[in-house]
Amino acid sequence: MVRRRGLSGLLEADIYGITAWEYSLGRSNIEVVAQMIEAGIKVIQYREKERPARQKYEECLKIREMTREAGVTFIVNDHVDLALLVDADGVHLGQDDLPADRVRELVGDKMIIGLSTHSPAQARAAEKMGVDYIGVGPIFATKTKKDVCDPVGLEYLEFVVKNISLPFVAIGGIKEHNIAEVSSRGAKCIALVTEIVGAEDIKAKVRALRAIISRKED
C-alpha cells in the first residue's frame, strides 16, 4: 500500500487552515501561514481564486518551504499544475474541476487528493474514485466561495460520519460560535477560513477553537 506523503498530518489534524487574502486584515498570505504554523495547525491549503498565476506560484513556493520545514501538510486548491510545480503534498479538487481519477494519473501515487462533496451521492462516488479524503459542506452559509451551493447542514455531515469510510474535513461557515455543533456530530477535522485568517491574534483564536473541540470530546 502506497503511503501518501503528508497524509498522516491530515489524518491527525483537528483544524484545517485555508488561505483567503482578502479577509486577512491586510496581512500577506505568507504572514498568515506563518501564524497558522506557529499556532500548531498541521494542514494548510492554499486557496486563492483571483490572483495572477505567477503570484500564486511565488506564494506557494514560499509556503511549501515554510510548511516543509515545520512538518505541516501543504495542499493546493484546484490547480494540479501548481501543486506539481511546488511539490505540494496534495491537491484539493471541486466537483467541476478535473476528474479525480485523471488527476491521479498526473500526480502519481504519493500525492494526496481531496475532493469537495455536497451530497450523499457525491460522497459515495468519491469512495470509488481513489481520493484520500473528502470535504463535507458547506455546513453553514459562507461568504468565501461565491459559486458554492446552498448549505448542506449538519444532516449531511451526520450521513458521512455514519456511512462513508473516507477521512473527511467539515467546511463552510464554521465559526467559534458553531464549531461545537460540528465537532459533536463527529467531525474530527474542521476547516475554517475567515474565522482564522480574519482573527487579529491567530494563535489565540486557534487556542480558543481547540478548547471548544476538546470540551466536546470529553
From Swiss-Prot:
Cofactor mode of binding and number, as noted:
Binds 1 Mg(2+) ion per subunit.
- Gene Ontology terms: biological process: thiamine biosynthetic process; thiamine diphosphate biosynthetic process
Q: Which SUPFAM superfamilies match?
A: Thiamin phosphate synthase (SSF51391)
Q: Name one Pfam family in it.
A: TMP-TENI
Q: Please provide the record's keywords in A-Z order.
A: Magnesium, Metal-binding, Thiamine biosynthesis, Transferase
Keyword Metal-binding listed:
yes
Q: Which CDD domains match?
A: TMP_TenI (cd00564)
The residues that hold Mg(2+) are D78, D97
Principal EC category: transferase
Sites where the protein binds 4-amino-2-methyl-5-(diphosphooxymethyl)pyrimidine: Q45, Y46, R47, E48, K49, N77, S116, K145
Biological pathway: Cofactor biosynthesis; thiamine diphosphate biosynthesis; thiamine phosphate from 4-amino-2-methyl-5-diphosphomethylpyrimidine and 4-methyl-5-(2-phosphoethyl)-thiazole: step 1/1
Please list the residues that bind 2-[(2R,5Z)-2-carboxy-4-methylthiazol-5(2H)-ylidene]ethyl phosphate: T142, K143, T144, G173, V193, T194
UniProt entry tagged with the keyword Transferase: yes
Alphabetical list of InterPro entries matching this protein: Aldolase_TIM (IPR013785), ThiamineP_synth_sf (IPR036206), ThiamineP_synth_TenI (IPR022998), TMP_synthase (IPR034291)
Family indicated by similarity? Belongs to the thiamine-phosphate synthase family.
Q: What does this protein do?
A: Condenses 4-methyl-5-(beta-hydroxyethyl)thiazole monophosphate (THZ-P) and 2-methyl-4-amino-5-hydroxymethyl pyrimidine pyrophosphate (HMP-PP) to form thiamine monophosphate (TMP).
Q: Which HAMAP family match?
A: TMP_synthase (MF_00097)
Which PANTHER family does the UniProt record give?
A: THIAMINE-PHOSPHATE PYROPHOSPHORYLASE, THIAMINE-PHOSPHATE SYNTHASE
What is the name of the protein in this document? Thiamine-phosphate synthase
Give the species: Pelotomaculum thermopropionicum (strain DSM 13744 / JCM 10971 / SI)
Lineage, uppermost ranks:
Bacteria, Bacillati, Bacillota, Clostridia, Eubacteriales
What gene is it encoded by?
thiE
